């Protein structure tokens, strides 16, 4: 068996984070697999230092619109297969997926849509949730071990945000969004952090304009989910709230497989 350390981080712009100690942080943290969301760049816009990092192979999923969305994986072990979507153009065109198949599991790195902008984006978000769930449940039902990480853009329970009552009618904490997470977990997936820590005030995103991070007025909207089949393999799940550079902090899991 080997120990694998996975980290996920919405970096809110990979070129911006590169100027804020990103390479030093990777060297120090030394994940086996690093998943990034909201990279906001096409690969052709990146310096070689961001494409080729030491012992990692990198894979980038780009939105058709420049400077928007985007996901990336840096991995020490080369995957058997990489996909950049679930076969639905309306979702795949926004660069929201990097799906890496390894011998022991399939890893989904996803930047889920934000539904705050307008009603049609909320509808898009909910349709995205359902399409993704159908896709991943089908794989799980075929006996695949699944790891899912990324910015889900929804806080699941009241414990997952500092101010639940004032936000009960805000996208990101709407009943229909929260109910989707209920359904998703009921379909055979686990919120890994809550296996190890049921304390309040554990957040992964803070509003930058109001300097909410200084007061820890945040939301937990970034997750590592696993299929039930991997429950016994997870040895740790955590957040890294002291890592700066984005409006999100990184999250991690360790798995023995």
Describe these PLM feature segments.
Residues 1-53, 63-69, 156:
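N-terminal, active-site-proximal structural segment of metallo-dependent hydrolase catalytic domains
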Residues 33, 54-57, 130-217, 221:
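Metal-dependent phosphoesterases centered on the DNase I-like endonuclease/exonuclease/phosphatase
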Residues 40-42, 47-115:
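Structured beta-strand-rich core segments of catalytic domains in phosphoester-bond hydrolases
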Residues 76, 100-103, 227-228, 253-257:
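Active-site beta-strand termini and strand-to-loop segments that position acidic
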Residues 87-88, 113-129, 166-169:
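Surface-exposed cleft-lining segments at the edges of enzyme active sites
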């Amino acid at each position: 068996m080997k120990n694998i350390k996975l980290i996920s981080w919405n970096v809110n712009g990979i070129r911006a984070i590169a100027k804020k100690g990103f390479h030093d942080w990777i060297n120090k943290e030394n994940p086996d697999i690093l998943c990034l969301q909201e990279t906001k760049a096409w690969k052709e816009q990146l310096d070689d230092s961001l494409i080729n990092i030491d012992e990692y192979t990198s894979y980038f999923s780009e939105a058709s619109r420049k400077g928007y969305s985007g996901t990336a994986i840096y991995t020490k072990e080369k995957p058997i297969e990489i996909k950049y979507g679930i076969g639905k153009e309306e979702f795949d065109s926004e660069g929201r997926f990097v799906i890496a198949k390894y011998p022991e599991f399939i890893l989904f790195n996803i930047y889920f849509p934000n539904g705050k902008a307008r009603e049609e984006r909320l509808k898009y978000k909910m349709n995205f949730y359902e399409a993704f769930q159908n896709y991943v449940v089908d794989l799980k039902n075929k006996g695949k071990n699944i790891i899912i990480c990324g910015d889900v853009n929804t806080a699941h329970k009241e414990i997952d945000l500092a101010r639940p009552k004032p936000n009960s009618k805000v996208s990101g904490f709407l009943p229909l969004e929260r109910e989707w997470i209920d359904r998703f977990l009921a379909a055979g997936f686990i919120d890994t952090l809550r296996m190890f820590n049921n304390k309040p005030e554990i957040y992964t995103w803070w509003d930058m304009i109001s300097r909410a991070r200084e007061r820890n007025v945040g939301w937990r909207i970034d997750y590592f989910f696993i299929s039930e089949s991997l429950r016994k393999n997870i040895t740790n799940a955590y957040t890294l709230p002291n890592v700066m550079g984005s409006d999100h902090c990184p999250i991690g899991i360790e798995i023995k497989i």
